Amino acid sequence: MTTAPITGPGASAETPAQGTTMADSEATTAFRQRIARIDREAEEHAAARQHAKGKRTARERINDLLDDSTFLEIGRYSGSGAGDKARPSGVVTGFGQIDGRQVAVYSQDFSVSGGALGTIEGDKIVRLLDDALRLRIPVIGLIDSGGAKIQEGVGALRQYGRIFNRTCAASGLVPQISVILGPCAGGAVYSPALTDFVIATRQASHMFVTGPDVVRATTGEQISAEDLGGAQIHGSVSGVVHYVADDEEDALGQVRTFLAYLPSSSEVSAPLYAYDDADAQADAEAARSVGEIVPASTRQAYDVVEVVSAVVDHGELVQVQEEFAPNVVVGFACFEGHPVGIVANQPLVDAGTLDVDASEKLARFVRFCDAFGLPVVTFVDVPGYRPGAEQEHAGIIRRGAKVINAYATATVPLVTIVLRKAYGGAYIVMGSKAIGADLNFCWPGAEIAVLGAAGAVGIIHRRDLAKVRDEQGEEAATAEHERLVAEYTDAVINPDKAVAIGEIDAVIAPEDTRSVIVDSLAALRAKNDARPESPKKHDNIPL
């Protein structure tokens, strides 16, 4: 049976001609032309504003970050609709891929009202974060905004609160990376601060709660935006920034580098990279000379980065917060294709001592690795904590306790290598067996004790040495001190005692370091350290 065409009063006067499809209908054609014009005008406007400052547009940044032709934009015309009054908002949101892995990304558009955040922009970011939580995919935020839309008042501030809420919900569940590519001021700074990693360009980015004008008006202090909250300040002084990039290309490239070591969520494993016999042979050969890097004297410095590079896959170590608290080193590397977190004391800077900044840096990194299932390999060469009133008044007790909490609560595989020395409380907190590490090793001659031999002898034999000095002179006292140091070293601080009580699992030759770490990680790969159910809601970390 056939149905006759509708005629009469109910029929539309605009009925398309017979044979017309949705692909070439008048509505579709008009839509294509309208959207093409709006998008072209918006991008031309954005390019004119951003390129003049040496900056990319919001969409150019997304295209540079993601794999080619993978970006799916969501909510492009939220707030305006796609009709004749269509216009872009101050943020671009959507999904794409990085090295074939799905991610969520938002990019603030400074060419639209200075990238200011209002109801529309906040709704788009919140929706993206909610989607990322459901999909269990990483979130990357490209920040370039003048702040909240003042004309929206508390409505704009509310959106910041909603974003903070979702960011906290995602913390430890999916990796979150913020890239500061322009201004980020006021309450907006807390959004990136809540994420796992903050990357900032050296020249264009600024972060501060109160800007130079407010500082000048309230305190009289004259300070530039760069000196107050530039990337270099946050990368080396405050520790807010984890990587200071030379330019936008470097910043976006670092996002891809970080993600290469991370799982898409805490529920899946990190990527596993191909690793063949040729790779193994080359890395084993490089690792044989690691002992030649480290001087036998505990008083001589060396670069621990060279030590780590000698034993990890392909010599590749990606440092995090390289310029902040340089007396310790943290970063990512691989062993036989498996990503791990690396922690190490740096004897080149303050002899590798621990201080307030180093403690913050170590604790946060270890907790991040634990949240996302990355084993932690710790290289120890530490004389203790940095002494002085400055450190005590800055809270070394409270902040140092964070490192203890991070290691003690970690459930991922923990492998520790003591290279030369580990003294006092610093030994305990740096991934010791007593604090919860799984496997601990040391090199021959490593000194593990409450104090170094010289300091211990000076305390234990203070009266005896004073008597020798009074009766026989300074030269005799010096000789006696050296004899007692050698005696104390042989009796107390050699590795044998640590091995005997189980604090050290084995003394290993330096050239065996890589193979021991590889074997240890393989043995611990199936580690299931789920803690028993507890009536407590969560621990009270000494924040």
Language model regions located:
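Ligand-binding clefts of soluble mixed alpha/beta catalytic domains
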Residues: 2-543
